[in-house]
């Protein structure tokens, strides 16, 4: 697509398509330029733009400026709809997801180290009737485990004694569930897929922007070569004409002699 494309990660505004927007070049002032690079999260990008230095071909659209336009008072872009590649993902969203799951889990299960204490006068027969059910990653129930077997208390278990539900501690913290099962093979990874996808998307956009710049440079080179070729052909034509004139003049002189 012709025209300028905004170099902000996640922004695809183009000067040819979005004619109502304005596109600004990076400031020449080193301080302002550094602030711009820090705000748009370009500094430190891996890939072909790991040492990103903006040129006249890199523009920032007016969407990222408060008020939709760069002015004397508003000189730095601060509005970004998508998170940059260098910004860490906020942990607030993760805590909300965990807290939303906690009430459901705490209503039926409790950790092994927080199970209801047995009464001292309870007989051994009651203990033998106690079964432990492990809950897998997708919420399915695994085969019951004998209560007498030793456990490290790192997995979530549901204890059913004599057909009655065990007491559940409602004060179980979110951190207990976040840390629970961290050492198991079925524990969830801490990496976020969206961040990786955004990083790869930014790298692809950087490659496309670099190729567009290279194509413009090659077009300018081809245009200059064509102009040079036409000039050389003109000079060659003039030399051929001068050569023909000299030959004609020599022929006339020989005839006179």
Swiss-Prot record:
It is found in: Nucleus; Cytoplasm. A zinc finger (THAP-type) spans 6-64. Disruption phenotype: Morpholino knockdown of the protein results in severe craniofacial abnormalities. At 4 days post fertilization (dpf), morphant embryos do not develop the major components of the viscerocranium, including Meckel's cartilage, the ceratohyal and the ceratobranchial cartilages. At 2 dpf, knockdown animals also show structural brain abnormalities. One of its GO terms (molecular function) is zinc ion binding. The keyword Metal-binding applies. Keywords: Activator, Coiled coil, Cytoplasm, DNA-binding, Metal-binding, Nucleus, Repressor, Transcription, Transcription regulation, Zinc, Zinc-finger. The keyword Coiled coil applies. It comes from the Eukaryota. SUPFAM superfamilies: Glucocorticoid receptor-like (DNA-binding domain). InterPro entries: THAP_Znf (IPR006612). GO terms for biological process: regulation of transcription by RNA polymerase II. Residues 196-251 form a coiled coil. One of its GO terms (cellular component) is cytoplasm. Transcription factor, which has both transcriptional activation and repression activities. Binds numerous promoters of genes and therefore can be involved in many processes. Also modulates chromatin accessibility. Required for normal brain development and neural precursor differentiation. Belongs to the THAP11 family. PANTHER family: THAP DOMAIN PROTEIN 11, THAP DOMAIN-CONTAINING PROTEIN 11. This is THAP domain-containing protein 11. The lineage of its organism: Eukaryota, Metazoa, Chordata, Craniata, Vertebrata. The gene is thap11.
């Amino acid at each position: 697509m012709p025209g300028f494309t905004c170099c902000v990660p996640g922004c695809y505004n183009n000067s040819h398509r979005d004619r109502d927007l304005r596109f600004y070049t990076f400031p020449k002032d080193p301080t302002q330029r550094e602030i711009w690079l820090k705000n748009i999260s370009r500094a430190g990008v891996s890939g072909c733009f790991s040492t990103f230095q903006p040129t006249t071909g890199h523009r920032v659209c007016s969407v990222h400026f408060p008020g939709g336009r760069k002015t004397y008072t508003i000189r730095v872009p601060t509005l970004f709809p998508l998170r940059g590649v260098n910004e860490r993902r906020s942990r607030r969203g993760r805590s909300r997801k965990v807290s939303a799951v906690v009430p459901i889990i705490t209503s039926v299960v409790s950790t092994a180290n927080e199970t209801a204490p047995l009464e001292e006068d309870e007989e051994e027969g009651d203990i033998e009737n106690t079964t432990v059910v492990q809950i897998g990653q997708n919420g399915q129930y695994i085969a019951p485990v004998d209560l007498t077997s030793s456990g490290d208390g790192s997995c979530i278990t549901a204890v059913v004694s004599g057909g009655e539900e065990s007491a559940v501690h409602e004060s179980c913290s979110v951190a207990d569930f976040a840390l629970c099962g961290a050492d198991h093979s079925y524990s969830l990874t801490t990496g976020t897929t969206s961040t990786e996808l955004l990083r790869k998307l930014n790298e692809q956009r950087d490659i496309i922007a670099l190729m567009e710049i290279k194509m413009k440079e090659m077009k300018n080179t081809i245009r200059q070569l064509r102009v040079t070729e036409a000039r050389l052909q003109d000079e060659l034509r003039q030399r051929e004409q001068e050569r023909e004139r000299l030959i004609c003049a020599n022929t006339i002189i020989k005839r006179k002699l």
